[in-house]
Amino acid sequence: MITRIWHGYTTLENADAYENLLKTEVFPSIEKKNVKGYRKISLLKRVMESEVEFITIMLFDDIQSVKQFVGEDYEQSYVPARAREILSHYDDRAQHYEIISEINY
């Protein structure tokens, strides 16, 4: 299993709008791609003094599944145009990690 981790940042004022955009447009559009091996996406949020950090963690079966999602240059970020309008800055590249162990309690 592969995790794909990406960071994006908004102003304090734009945080709610960005969160709503992710939940109502971006995440559903990813699901509609029907990427084989795409398992789930998690959204994390951290409010800081002058901005809000959002982290997405996507779970895929393998790197081939990630490539089906974003192309051969699989580390490129996936940031739709509407999201770019709201974000103040974001990672140009996503990080990918192989899950080597997982413990559930």
Predicted feature residues:
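A broad, low-specificity signal for short, low-complexity segments enriched in glycine/proline
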Residues: M1-I5, N14-L21, I55-L59, D92
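A structural signal for alpha-helix termini and helix-coil/disorder junctions
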Residues: P28, K32, E72, S88-H89
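Short, well-ordered beta-strand segments in beta-rich or mixed alpha/beta enzyme
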Residues: T3-Y9, S42-Y74
